[in-house]
């Protein structure tokens, strides 16, 4: 299989440089944040309080809880970070529905006892990949946006220090760069399952989702190459491709999904290639 590409610096033309900077709290170790600012080519503000920042709309902010993406100014919503130990993902790890969870059903974990090799081609903050890894899947994750990649890498590092999470994180390998390039080079049957969750216009009104999507929209935008991702995924998956979509949204342009697993706000379109092993 091809080696993953690495891309840690924002493009020179990126407008993010005008709205995003890196800073840290008095309780955080500044070295990691300062190195990140250098790698990404972003302005370094040192110790600041996000609500007092006026020149930038967003901060990559390191505090005692880890790295976060934080809107600035008075009244800004709280930080967005990759968190697997506590909060929603911690509760889901301890009390989740096992292989009956929607993403696990879509990947096919109720149909096979074989450990699946899954490529999460659009990893984001890694929540679905963490669920699948907690159920035994060997996960390869790609996140091409360097800001989101930094958040996810930090979350996985912190989780690796937790006794309960460390075995799960050991089944997750994160790469930077574009999964589309990797899939186009990988060839047939490179992985068992490819999982896609492209960015889409989100209409969920819950406060958490709204906060996360507001910030993500500024940093990532939409994935305009979703149909290309699907085509490449179908060319390198052994058993199936799974695409997460809003429940009422149309399928990605291309072949029609053969099956769907639906939840309250989202669904999983399934593109089978061959039957999963028993």
From Swiss-Prot:
GO CC, one annotated term: cytoplasm
EC number: 2.1.1.242
Keywords linked to the UniProt accession: Cytoplasm, Methyltransferase, rRNA processing, S-adenosyl-L-methionine, Transferase
Keyword Cytoplasm found: yes
InterPro entries linked to this entry: 16SrRNA_methylTrfase_J, SAM-dependent_MTases_sf
Localization in the cell: Cytoplasm
Keyword Transferase: yes
Molecular function in Gene Ontology: rRNA (guanine-N2-)-methyltransferase activity
Pfam families in alphabetical order: SAM_MT (PF04445)
Reactions listed under catalytic activity: guanosine(1516) in 16S rRNA + S-adenosyl-L-methionine = N(2)-methylguanosine(1516) in 16S rRNA + S-adenosyl-L-homocysteine + H(+)
Positions annotated to bind S-adenosyl-L-methionine: 143-144, 197
Gene3D superfamilies registered for this protein in UniProt: Vaccinia Virus protein VP39 (3.40.50.150)
Residues annotated as signal peptide: none
Catalytic EC class: transferase
Family: Belongs to the methyltransferase superfamily. RsmJ family.
PANTHER family: RIBOSOMAL RNA SMALL SUBUNIT METHYLTRANSFERASE J
Entry protein name: Ribosomal RNA small subunit methyltransferase J
Organism of origin: Marinobacter nauticus (strain ATCC 700491 / DSM 11845 / VT8) (Marinobacter aquaeolei)
This protein's encoding gene: rsmJ
């Amino acid at each position: 299989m091809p080696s993953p590409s690495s891309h840690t610096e924002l493009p020179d033309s990126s407008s993010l440089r005008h709205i995003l900077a890196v800073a840290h709290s008095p309780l955080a170790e500044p070295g990691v944040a300062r190195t990140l600012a250098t790698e990404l080519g972003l302005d370094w503000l040192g110790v600041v309080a996000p609500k007092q920042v006026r020149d930038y709309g967003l901060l990559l902010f390191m505090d005692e809880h880890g790295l976060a993406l934080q809107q600035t100014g008075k009244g800004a919503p709280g930080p967005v970070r990759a968190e697997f130990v506590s909060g929603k993902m911690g509760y889901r790890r301890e009390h989740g529905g096992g292989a009956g969870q929607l993403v696990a059903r879509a990947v096919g974990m109720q149909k096979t006892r074989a450990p699946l090799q899954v490529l999460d081609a659009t990893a984001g903050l890694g929540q679905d990949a963490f669920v699948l890894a907690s159920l035994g899947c060997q996960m390869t994750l790609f996140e091409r946006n360097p800001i989101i990649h930094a958040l996810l890498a930090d979350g996985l590092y912190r989780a690796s220090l937790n006794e309960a999470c460390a075995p799960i994180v050991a089944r997750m390998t994160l790469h930077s760069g574009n999964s589309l390039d990797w899939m186009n080079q990988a060839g047939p049957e490179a992985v068992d399952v490819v999982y896609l969750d492209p960015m889409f216009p989100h209409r969920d009104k819950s406060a958490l989702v709204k906060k996360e999507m507001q910030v993500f929209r500024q940093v990532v935008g939409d994935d305009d190459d979703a149909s290309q991702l699907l085509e490449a995924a179908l060319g390198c998956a052994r058993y199936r491709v799974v695409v997460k979509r809003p429940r009422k949204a149309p399928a990605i342009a291309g072949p029609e999904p053969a099956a769907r697993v639906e939840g309250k706000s989202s669904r999983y379109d399934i593109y089978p290639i061959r039957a999963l092993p028993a």
